[in-house]
């Protein structure tokens, strides 16, 4: 049981246009989404060809600890609103489920991340692909822990690679038990060291002006890989693709996480730390699709959508389109795309 800080799907968020109530080719996501309550003990594993489960992580405590601009706790609501009208560009054998939200209210960040970990573990055990809606980027720690917990039932030492699209390395120092939205991948490194696991971390879109020299030194010490945003924007992308290939070949599983501050503020103004020289979303989506085609991706999240700063839901809409691209790409991999 996930307790009172888990709230099952609120179907009111899934409202939109209806062109037909019978013709699936005219359906939008709000007509196809099904609620799923992770607190139920009698849930049977999904036996269809391909299923996705959305879960929101309503939290910005990590952002507050990181002295950023709070507001991302409301992100999952607005992302759902933007996803509601997306078209079903897949066959009816692809199923979409909404698993509700983890609410980090009147509990610690660490308790919230533990709840998310349990939720991700359960979603994976149901044979569904988790897509987490943030929430601060502290969502990454809970998502990773859930993936790790699930994979340990298969292999005591799973080989998981992390690909993070982010302007920040997020490997800041932290006090034990007091992480933030800037510490997750250092926390994961410490877990890997403690449990003798492989630590494979690649950060795409790093901004030199957003990280201290000590953080780059720490990344090198930890064996982390990173690609600067300027090298993606102005460099030879084939070199970047080769770097991705080298990284992905060494992994058995890949967890992909996107911090919305990787994007230029022209496309993503509603974030904790906006980036005037961030990446063009078209480039990021191109890389995400390439990574998905490795067929190793086990979980995905997009974080730091902050409605408080998001005039016209521009950033939430971008997050929805990124998620659309993820589902569209995986559906095509399974031969279920239209």
UniProtKB/Swiss-Prot annotation:
Classification via HAMAP family:
Formimidoylglutam
- Quote the PANTHER family the UniProt record gives: ARGINASE/AGMATINASE, FORMIMIDOYLGLUTAMASE
Output this protein's name: Formimidoylglutamase
Cofactor or coenzyme needed: Mn(2+)
**PROSITE patterns, per database record:** ARGINASE_2
Q: Which GO terms describe its biological process?
A: L-histidine catabolic process to glutamate and formamide; L-histidine catabolic process to glutamate and formate; putrescine biosynthetic process from arginine, via agmatine
Question: TM segments?
Answer: none
Pathway where it operates: Amino-acid degradation; L-histidine degradation into L-glutamate; L-glutamate from N-formimidoyl-L-glutamate (hydrolase route): step 1/1
Spell out the reaction equation it catalyses.
N-formimidoyl-L-glutamate + H2O = formamide + L-glutamate
Instruction: Tell me, in a sentence or two, what this protein's role is.
Output: Catalyzes the conversion of N-formimidoyl-L-glutamate to L-glutamate and formamide.
The record's NCBIfam families line, in alphabetical order, gives: hutG (TIGR01227)
Could you say which EC number(s) this protein's record lists? 3.5.3.8
Family of the protein in this entry: Belongs to the arginase family.
The record's comment on cofactor binding reads: Binds 2 manganese ions per subunit.
What GO molecular function annotations does the UniProt record carry, in alphabetical order?
Answer: agmatinase activity; formimidoylglutamase activity; manganese ion binding
Q: Where does Mn(2+) 1 bind?
A: 137, 166, 170, 259
Q: Which Pfam families match?
A: Arginase
UniProt KW keywords:
Histidine metabolism, Hydrolase, Manganese, Metal-binding
**Top-level EC class as recorded in UniProt:** hydrolase
Sequence positions that bind Mn(2+) 2:
166, 168, 259, 261
Annotated organism of origin: Clostridium tetani (strain Massachusetts / E88)
